[in-house]
Amino acid sequence: MGLVVGGALIALAVAPDVVRAQDAPKSPVRPRSTYEDLQMFTQVLNQIRVNHPDSIDTHDLLMAAIEGMVRAADPHSYVIPAMRLDPAKEEQLRSGKLHPVPVSFVFIGGAPVVASVAPGTAATRLDILPGDELIAVDGASVRAESAEELEISLSGPKQSAVVLTLERRRQDGTIVRLDRRVVRERPDPASAVPVAMMIDSAGTAYVRITTFAAERVADDLHDALDRLEKRGLKRLVLDLRDNGGGSVKEAADVAGEFLPKGAIVYTAEGRKKEVTDTGRVSRSFWRSERRYPIVVMTNSGTASASEIVAGALQDHDRALIVGHPTFGKSLLMRGFPLADGSAIVLVIGHVKTPCGRVLQRQYRSITTHEYYRLARADRDTAGRPACVTSGGRRVFGGGGIYPDVLLGEERTAPVWLARLVEQDVVLSWVGGYVSASSQSLGSLDAFLRAPAVPAAAVADFRTFAATQGVVVPADAESDAVLQRMLAEGVARARWGDAGGYSVEALVDQEVRAAVRALDRAGTLSGAGSAR
C-alpha cells in the first residue's frame, strides 16, 4: 500500500492490527437485518470517534447521517433542525409586517434550487430560472437547511432588496454565476390570470394562468371566461407554460370549469390509508360546464398543480395538449414534529391522473443539475408506460404530461441573447425607452394592433448593447428574435405582466401552433363520465 507523491511511490508501514481491505470479512450473501445495519452504523460511528485524528463533533456526524438518510429517500424531503427558525421573524412574515423575496426554493440534494419566481413581481424580469442554484445571499454563504428557514431568513422590510448569487448550468454544459438584486414584495393575487384576450376573428381566446398559488385562481379564470364568452369566445387556448403549480384545490376547480360534476381530476396514493384520496369536480349549481374546444399549452416549466389540470383534461379527452413534456413533479408532503423540537417534512404520497399516470418522474441516482436538465430533455415515448383516455386514445406516463402535439425542442437561447438578459442590457435599455416614449406608446390595445418597436429604436438598442460588450448578429433570424424581445420588454415595462404576456401571445410561434391544433381539439370525444 502506498501514496504517489511527485510521481514517486512512497511506501507506508502498515501496523499488524490494521485490517487490509482485501482481508476484511466478505459481505454476507443473505440480506442484512435492520438490527445488523444499526450495529454497523454504531461501530462506524465509534471507530470515527476513537481513531480519527481530527476532533469531530459527534452531533455533526449524526446530523450528517440523518441528512444523508433523508436524501437517500428522495430529493424533496428534508429535516428542519430545532432552533433553526426565528419564531419572531416568522410571525412578522406571516402577519405581513415583513415581506418575502418573491422567489421560491426547494432543497434538492441539500442545495437550495430555484423552483419558481412569483408572477406579477419585478423579479420576473431578472432572468431567474428554475434550476438555478443559490450560492450566496448578499455575499455570504447560504446557511439555511430548509425551504422554510430560507424563506424566513430572506424576508425583510417592504421594497428592500437582497442580492442573490445564483449558479446556472447552461445547456452546453458551461456554468455561469449571476448576481441578481431582488426586491422584497408580495405578489399581486390578480397576476395569476394576467391575460385573457381574443386573438383572432374566428372566436379564439387566449388565457394564461401563471400560478396556482393564489387564492382566487379558479374564480379569476371563471370571471375571465365569462367576459370572453360575451365577446364571442368559441374556442380556447389555455397557456400553462412555466406555471410551477400551487394549490391542488385551485387546480381541481380550474379543471372543473371544463369537466362534468363528479369527474375525477386526480387520485393520491400513499402508504397510509388516510393519504389515499380522489379529487373530483365539485361545482356550484349555477356554474355550468364549458364545452368549447380547448388546447392546453405546456412546457418543461409546467409542474405540480398545473400538471394535474393538463392531465385531467387530457385523460377525459376534454383538451388537446400542445407543446413540450411537463416537468414531472407532483408529490404529497407533510411535516412531522420530532421529540427535540425539530421536524421532518416528508414525501407521503404520489399523485396520479384519472387514468392512472404517475405525475412524478424518476429522481433516484441523479444529481440536482440532471434532475432539472432531464426535465427539458425528456422527449422520447420509448419506455414510457401508456394508459387509455375516456375516448380510447393512448397517452403516455412515466413522469409528467406528454403532449398530444409535440413541438420542436425548446430552443436554447443563443449566447448573445443569454448575455443580453444575464447582464440586464435589455432591462436597462427598455426602461429608458419607455420613459422617453410614454406619450407615443399610447394604450396597450393600440400597441397590440402592431406589437413592434420602430427600426430606429432597434438600431439604437444594437448600439447600446455594443457599448455593454454584447454584439447582436446582423441577420434576419436575429433581427426577428430581437424585435420580439424588445416589443415584449417594452409592453411589460409599460403595462406590466398583462402587456408582456399579451405581446407574447400575438408573436409567439408556439401560440400559433396551438391555434392551428384547435380544429383537432374540436374532434375529441369530450369529457368522459365520472369513473
Q: What do the predicted segments below correspond to?
A:
Residues 22, 26-27, 32-37, 46-58, ...:
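Cleft-lining beta-strand/loop regions that shape enzyme active-site pockets
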